[in-house]
Amino acid sequence: MEELAHPYVPRDLNLPGYVPISMSMSSIVSIYLGSSLLVVSLVWLLFGRKKAKLDKLLMCWWTFTGLTHVILEGYFVFSPEFFKDNTSAYLAEVWKEYSKGDSRYVGRDSAVVSVEGITAVIVGPASLLAIYAIAKEKSYSYVLQLAISVCQLYGCLVYFITAILEGDNFATNSFYYYSYYIGANCWWVLIPSLISFRCWKKICAAAAIANNNVETKTKKKTR
């Protein structure tokens, strides 16, 4: 039986049993954005006036990124043959579509699978823990957010650098390259960078106050 041609680059990428995408790009993107907006809106409304606006924005971000890591990326990691799916399962369709921007996903590139695996299993749950930490004003909130953000930035660096080292030629065309490979990932560079900077300042300020308190107590004891 002749194998169906796939739309990915390189054209000779071996995908035995490949089943073409059945959903349109607009449907896939609309469902993702719509469901994300719904969940984020619920988080925003749930905390209402209980939290400052910035805290609510952070909780919305951690909800969005945490669920994306656990559900979307988790599916990719544990479904190595998603390209064979013939049931029109939404998550399989997402990765068939996204692979037009980076065929390393459908080709199961070891670097991509490793980064996504760590992200789905560790960073995702940690992101959801950050929601609780902010809501309950836990002392570890800033340290946790900084650690997660640094992990996300590191993952993005590995993701982009390995692509460059391998030739950076994994997109079907420039549209998918800039909309999926660049556009969909740039938020995980920009937002974690801003959060890291803020958390670093907060941690340094707290450390300075703690040091001042220690110095004050020491001076009182020596008098």
Swiss-Prot record:
Catalytic activity of the protein: lathosterol = 5alpha-cholest-8-en-3beta-ol
Recorded hits in InterPro entries, A to Z, give:
EBP, EXPERA
Which EC numbers does the record give? Answer: 5.3.3.5
- Keywords for this entry? Endoplasmic reticulum, Isomerase, Lipid biosynthesis, Lipid metabolism, Membrane, Steroid biosynthesis, Steroid metabolism, Sterol biosynthesis, Sterol metabolism, Transmembrane, Transmembrane helix
Q: Which EC class heads this enzyme's classification?
A: isomerase
- What's the superkingdom here? Eukaryota
Q: EXPERA domain location, by residue?
A: 54-196
Please tell me where this protein is predominantly located: endoplasmic reticulum
Membrane-crossing segments per the record: 28-48, 58-78, 115-135, 175-195
Tell me the compartments it is located in.
Answer: Endoplasmic reticulum membrane
Q: Report one GO cellular component.
A: endoplasmic reticulum membrane
| MF GO annotations | C-8 sterol isomerase activity; cholestenol delta-isomerase activity
Q: Name one GO biological process term.
A: sterol biosynthetic process
Q: How does it sit in the membrane?
A: Multi-pass membrane protein
Which pathway is this protein assigned to?
Answer: Steroid biosynthesis; sterol biosynthesis
Report the function annotation for this chain. Catalyzes the conversion of Delta(8)-sterols to their corresponding Delta(7)-isomers.
Q: Which family does it belong to?
A: Belongs to the EBP family.
What is this protein's record name?
Probable 3-beta-hydroxysteroid-Delta(8),Delta(7)-isomerase
Q: Which organism is it from?
A: Arabidopsis thaliana
